[in-house]
A protein has these predicted regions:
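Active-site HxH/HxHxD metal-binding segment of metal-dependent hydrolases
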Residues: 447-486
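Aromatic-rich juxtamembrane segments at the membrane interface
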Residues: 27-156, 163-164, 417, 539-544, ...
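Cap/insert and terminal regions of metallo-dependent hydrolase folds
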Residues: 464, 551-621
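Internal transmembrane alpha-helical bundles of multi-pass membrane proteins
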Residues: 148-352, 552-567, 577-587
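Di-metal (Zn2+ and/or Mg2+/Mn2+) metal-binding site signature of metallo-dependent hydrolases
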Residues: 99-123, 436-459, 543, 564-578
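Active-site environment of divalent metal-dependent phosphoester hydrolases
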Residues: 110, 150-152, 423-424, 445-450, ...
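Core dinuclear metal-dependent hydrolase active-site scaffold
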Residues: 71, 83, 184-194, 328-439, ...
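Membrane-interface helix/helix-cap signal primarily in integral membrane proteins
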Residues: 1-101, 427, 436, 458, ...
Length: 622
């Protein structure tokens, strides 16, 4: 569908739920979602909107974003078409590097488009007054052509207020322009106040206009600019250029830090992850944005010219590929993006800090800044060591919905047995303060045990991936690609007798005893987990989805255990009374049960008879 297009369809309507997505949709005026079964009528947009929508589709077709990553990026920044960015996984790459703002059409893109139009009008000899009005009107067409993102609308309204102020003989004032833009947009569409793009755009611009000069002064106080005398090794003709380059770098870094600090809370609460390399990545990739957008716009304007259009598009494609390559390098850095769990009230912290800073406005002092920086670093190191290094030995059954994910930790070491069904695993690990994994063991290849590998890849650094013997050659194409992203090409295999050690834990593989393909429950890797000795130790049996026929083969090797992870979610065939008696469970057996495969009463009865301290944990699908 294109902007302005309408459909009449027959389908099933689902009202908003009470989860975060439902609350967000309701706040934006969305009543619910409809799954269309059949489209009966379709009306294309008419008038100016229809013309601009057709022009946009023509520009996207000319760029051909499906032809490569560079073309996909061009379509995103020139025409606001991000379909191929998402399809090719580039949206996640830019997000991990903290550069999502580069692919979202915003004020920087509009400023370049406006400068291009005004430059063309200047070359045509149009007088100053009419030139400003014409440039403003023509640049306004860029906004609907990019599907009217809130950030671009905000930027154009600010530009219009600035042009109007200059026409009236008044100097520009960014906070006033931002206030006018925000007020007009909220009055025309109150629901836009709940749009994330609008919130991030307003926060960034407000912070830059209020604290940008202060941030530059602070950086100058912390890292004093080099004088010409200190540039003795630099050739004299290059010294002015080096000084200018230093000012430019400090200015860009200050702007990036201000934007990052003002929006991190909203981003963390909304997405559950924070980029740690954003300011440095912006410093390296940001200077390429202006030539990339300019080359893309000129290439689209001259697309009809046989040779010139193709040449300019090739140049823009090359620049875009360079941007993608640099972004991938930053996204691939360890801990470039960290999963976090942040309460919603944290969104107020940047506002409180900003108000205090405006009220006090302390003069930047190098000595004070150094002391504050060292103190903050010491506190950060202490918190890091407490949360991520000095961790007691534990085994945790993670809440990931309809699937299995068991976390084993001892100090700074962590291992995950199965990854759950989808993208809940990173949030679950964040709740446990896990930044990295020594290894992941996948018991078998069912989706409710492997679905989280895609979410882990690129976000949680992982040392090794283990599967059952013979399974590494049977991985489905998509899962194999995700596994390569997670640990590279080296995937280990486990068979009966192998051991995996993690801190004080030892995990002995009891099953499989022969080559499998991992496609069946009986192919599940079964692990006997032990820690310590005697009454102070722990013995736990992890069975994946293995059922009673597999337990018959390994129960004699297990002996007494403290904890049993019941196979196949406690199904009817997961355990029989004889096996429960032989295992002699001491205190509890965590079980995951779903609506489609519930914990059977017979299994419950056997477990309660075998383990007086039995507890069952159910997770119901919605």
């Amino acid at each position: 569908m294109t902007r302005g297009e309408r459909l009449r369809a027959i389908g099933r309507f689902s009202p908003n739920g009470s989860d975060d997505w439902g609350v967000s949709s309701r706040s934006q005026g969305i009543a619910g979602r409809m799954r269309a079964v059949r489209i009966t009528e379709r009306w294309h947009a008419g008038g100016v909107v229809g013309v601009l929508a057709g022009l946009r589709e023509g520009v996207v077709a000319r760029i051909a974003p499906e032809r490569g990553e560079g073309r996909a990026l061009l379509a995103g920044i020139v025409a606001g078409d991000r379909r191929e960015l998402k399809a090719q996984g580039l949206s996640d790459v830019f997000s991990a590097a903290g550069l999502s703002h580069l692919v979202a059409v915003s004020g920087a893109h509009l400023a370049i488009a406006h400068a291009l139009v005004e430059g063309l009008l200047l070359c045509a000899g149009v007088p100053c007054g009419p030139r400003r009005v014409l440039a403003l009107g023509l640049s306004a067409l860029f906004v609907p052509m990019c599907s009217c993102p809130a950030s671009a609308v905000r930027a154009w309204v600010m530009l219009a207020s600035s042009v109007a102020g200059k026409g009236a003989g008044r100097r520009g004032h960014a906070p006033s322009g931002l206030a006018i833009a925000g007020s007009l947009m909220c009055l025309s569409d109150p629901f836009c106040a709940c749009d994330l793009g609008f919130q991030l755009s307003m926060l960034s611009v407000a912070s830059l206009s209020l604290f940008g000069p202060y941030a530059r002064a602070t950086l100058n106080a912390l890292i004093a600019p080099r004088t010409y005398r200190e540039m003795r090794l630099t050739p004299r003709p290059l010294r002015p250029h080096m000084a200018k380059l230093g000012r430019s770098v400090r200015s860009s870094l200050a702007a990036s830090l201000v934007c990052q600090l003002s929006t991190w809370a909203v981003v963390a609460v909304t997405f559950g992850r924070v980029s740690t390399v954003g300011p440095i990545a912006s410093l390296a990739v940001g200077p390429l944005l202006s030539p990339l957008v300019l080359a893309g716009l000129v290439a689209c304007l001259l697309a009809a010219v046989p040779v010139v259009g193709g040449l300019l598009l090739a140049v823009a494609d090359g620049l875009a590929c360079l941007v993608v390559a640099l972004t991938r390098q930053f996204a691939a850095l360890p801990f470039s993006s960290v999963a976090v769990v942040v309460p919603r009230w944290v969104e107020l912290l940047p506002i409180i800090v900003a108000l205090l800073l405006l009220a006090l406005w302390p003069r930047p002092s190098r000595r004070v800044l150094a002391r504050v920086s060292l103190g903050g670093l010491a506190v950060a190191i202490a918190i890091f060591v407490r949360l991520y290094v000095l961790v007691p030995a534990s085994v945790t059954v993670l809440d990931v919905g309809q699937g299995d994910a068991i976390l084993v930790r001892d100090g700074p070491h962590a291992l995950l047995v199965d990854t759950g069904p989808g993208d809940a695993i990173t949030d679950a690990l964040a709740r446990q303060h896990v930044l990295w994994l020594d290894a992941v063991i996948v018991t078998h290849l069912h989706d409710d045990h492997t679905g989280g590998i895609d979410d882990l890849a690129g976000l949680v650094p992982t040392g090794s991936l283990y599967v059952g013997e013979g399974v590494s050659g049977s991985l489905p194409e998509g899962l194999g690609r995700d596994a390569d992203r997670l640990v590279g090409s080296g995937i280990g295999e486990l068979c009966a007798g192998d051991e995996v050690r993690l801190g004080g834990f030892t995990m002995t593989c009891l099953w499989p005893r022969e080559v499998t393909d991992g496609s069946e429950n009986e192919d599940s890797v079964c692990l006997l987990l032990t820690y310590g000795e005697g009454g102070a130790g722990l013995r736990m049996l992890l069975t994946g989805d293995a059922e009673s026929n597999v337990l018959d083969s390994i129960v004699s090797q297990v002996g007494d255990i403290d904890v049993l992870k019941v196979g196949h979610h406690g199904s009817r065939v997961s355990l029989d009374g004889g096996q429960a008696a032989v295992l002699r469970l001491r205190w509890q057996a965590p079980v995951r049960a779903t609506r489609t495969d519930t914990l059977r009463p017979s299994a419950l009865r056997r477990l309660r008879e075998a383990a007086p301290g039995f507890c069952a944990r159910r997770t119901m699908a919605t």
